[in-house]
């Protein structure tokens, strides 16, 4: 009888320990998840031989095939351009920005733009309202010069902005965003990336990636 009681207590103790271990692992995982959103990112201003879009894409593809995990995003600054709704010819001015690599480093909401989507775009709410009269315009088309884009999503940015995946291979990237690895300072992360890819640049600023597009717009 006493032996059965001991076995029961032992089994109960094992269950309790398993539950506590699972809870501890869950809590640890949640802490790591939360930290991802607060990770500092280096904004590097490139100079010298600016990498063209095709080179930026090649660098990104090379990293995807390697064992080294590095999160980065090249940025092409298209400046303020006229954006048009081809159906009713409504127009507005918007800052056009192209990204190559992990778009979410530019802004979390930029993840709406898939990696190889060269015909899609993400725009801010004000641009959507001025062009389409509504924020619910996903799937609608707009033009910039002779280029036609389809709206993939509308996001909350504080200025007229249009985000794309640049398709013209000769366009050059003037910035790169780099997320430092755990325990690595941003200067080291920027230096390693630049040297490893034969690029020249200077660390301009670092920021918490929740406000990425605002920081870049003010540079």
Locate predicted features.
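The feature marks short, hydrophobic/small-residue-biased sequence motifs that occur predominantly
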Residues: 73-115
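Conserved small/polar residues in nucleotide/adenosyl-binding loops
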Residues: 208-215
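Extracytoplasmic/periplasmic regions of membrane proteins
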Residues: 40-45, 50-53, 98, 108-111, ...
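Membrane-proximal extracellular/periplasmic loop immediately following the first transmembrane helix
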Residues: 28-82
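A residue-level structural signature of the nucleotidyltransferase/glycosyltransferase Rossmann-like core
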Residues: 119-120, 141
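Mid-to-C-terminal secondary-structure elements
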Residues: 100-109, 125-182, 187-190, 194-199
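Hydrophobic secretory-pathway targeting helix
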Residues: 2-36
């Amino acid at each position: 009888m006493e032996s059965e009681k001991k076995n029961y207590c032992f089994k109960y103790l094992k269950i309790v320990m398993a539950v506590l271990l699972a809870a501890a692992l869950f809590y640890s995982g949640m802490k790591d998840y939360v930290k991802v959103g607060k990770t500092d990112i280096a904004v590097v201003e490139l100079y010298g031989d600016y990498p063209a879009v095709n080179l930026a894409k090649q660098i990104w593809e090379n990293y995807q095939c390697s064992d080294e995990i590095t999160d980065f995003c090249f940025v092409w600054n298209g400046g303020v351009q006229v954006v048009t709704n081809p159906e009713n010819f409504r127009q507005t001015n918007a800052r056009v920005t192209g990204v190559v690599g992990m778009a979410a480093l530019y802004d979390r909401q930029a993840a709406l733009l898939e990696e190889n989507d060269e015909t899609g775009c993400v725009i801010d709410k004000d641009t959507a309202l001025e062009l389409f009269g509504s924020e619910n315009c996903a799937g609608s088309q707009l033009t910039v010069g002779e280029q036609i884009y389809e709206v993939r999503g509308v996001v909350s940015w504080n200025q007229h902005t249009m985000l794309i995946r640049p398709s013209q291979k000769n366009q050059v990237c003037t910035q790169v965003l780099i997320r430092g690895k755990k325990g690595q300072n941003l200067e080291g992360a920027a230096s390693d990336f630049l040297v490893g890819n034969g690029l020249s640049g200077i660390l301009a600023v670092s920021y918490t990636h929740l406000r990425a597009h605002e920081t870049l717009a003010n540079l």
